[in-house]
């Protein structure tokens, strides 16, 4: 297994339940921002139950490919509370995982 594949699997394992990341996001977090297609291929071929490949989607909220079926990917995401309509994730701003974005604390009145 190449170092890049190892980094991709580490990143994907960090995606929380109920969140998604795009192939491009995962590629960037794994150190190769132009390798979105490679991430897609890694996800397609991954058969490891400890890697939540279903949480990795295509740009714009499209479900993209999956080693299982698109219906299974849709069902797994829905079971985690991710709203999917047709072949797109809805409320993308709310469910996209971005570990680089810092959360700001809101002051209480």
Please tell me what each predicted stretch does:
Residues 1-109:
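Nucleic acid-binding interface residues in structured DNA/RNA-binding domains
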